[in-house]
Amino acid sequence: RVNTSADILATWQNNLQDLCEKQALAIPALVASNPRNHVVSSAAQGLSLGAGKFTAWPGELGLAAARDEAMVYQFADYSRQEWLSIGLRKGYMYMADLATEPRWMRIEGTFGESAELAASVMKQIVLGFQGPKLNPSSIALTTKHFPGGGAVENGHDPHFEWGKRELFEGGKFENNLI
C-alpha cells in the first residue's frame, strides 16, 4: 500500500519473483493492488494508490458519467498494460455497489445509482483488464462488494459491525442483481 514510483514497484516485484524462483517449488508470488489509475485530490498513504505515478483517468463516478463504453474499455486496457509492465497481476477492484444510500461514505468509489449504467461500466472494465477470456496478459479482478454494499443502514460502512445491515427499500434488492 505504498504510493511509490512505477520503477521502484517494478524492481521490488522483480526481486520478489527472483526470491520465489529460488525456493524449492518456485511458485511465483501474486501481488495485488487497489485501483491506481485515477485522479485524486490527496495521495494519502495506503489510499489513492498510484496517484501521480500512473496514468490518471477520471474516478469511478467520472467514468460512469462519461457514458462512453469505448472510453471505459480504453481506460481499463491502458491501465492493464501499465500494471503488467511492473508485475501487478491482480486488482481488488471495482465496486459494483449501487449508490442508493446518500449517507454512505464510499459513494465516490461507485459508478452511481443506475444498475444498468454500473453493469455497463463494469463489463468494459472487466474486458479491458482481463479480456474476453483469461490469458497471460490478463489482470485478475475481484469485484466488490456483492450484493449491495451501497444500501447500508444509515450509510455506515459494511466493513464494520454497525454497518452490517443492508436495506433495500421498496424491494430494490433485485436491482443489485443486474
What kind of feature is each model-predicted range?
Residues R1-I178:
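Glycoside hydrolase catalytic-domain context in secreted enzymes
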